[in-house]
């Protein structure tokens, strides 16, 4: 697949096949996603892979999804969930600790979005459907 085709064809997938995704494949996708650009190359994105059915079920609740019932159903049926987190206090800062711009430390939100899209495109290339659910804030 070429990049333009992947960008045009990749879709959010909320109905997943009833089979596990090999951990090795998820790891490969994460490794590719780590090449996503970030503010001043701070590389703040971190990935947590959840492929244990009991732990996935624990994520599929009102508290984690802020009551979005559709997200609860999507998570509950997923064979794996990848949580994208960021390292706080690195993006938007100079080496002396001062802010680089008036956006202060909010660059990590942009970096997380870039990393999430890169992950989804890599997953698509590997034949794995994905959807971005932005519901955790803590």
Please describe what each predicted stretch is:
Residues 31-35, 66-69:
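Glycine-rich, charged/polar anion/phosphate-binding loops
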């Amino acid at each position: 697949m070429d990049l333009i085709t992947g960008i045009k064809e990749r879709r959010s997938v909320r109905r997943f096949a009833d089979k596990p995704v090999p951990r090795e494949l998820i790891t490969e996708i994460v490794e590719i996603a780590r090449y996503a650009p970030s503010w001043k190359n701070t590389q703040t994105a971190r990935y947590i892979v959840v492929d244990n059915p009991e732990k996935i079920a624990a994520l599929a609740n009102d508290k984690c999804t802020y009551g979005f019932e559709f997200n609860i159903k999507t998570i509950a049926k997923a064979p794996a969930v990848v949580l994208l987190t960021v390292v706080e206090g690195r993006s938007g800062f100079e080496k002396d600790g001062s802010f680089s711009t008036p956006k202060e430390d909010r660059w990590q939100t942009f970096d997380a979005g870039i990393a999430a899209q890169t992950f989804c495109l890599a997953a698509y290339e590997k034949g794995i459907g994905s959807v971005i659910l932005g519901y955790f804030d803590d």
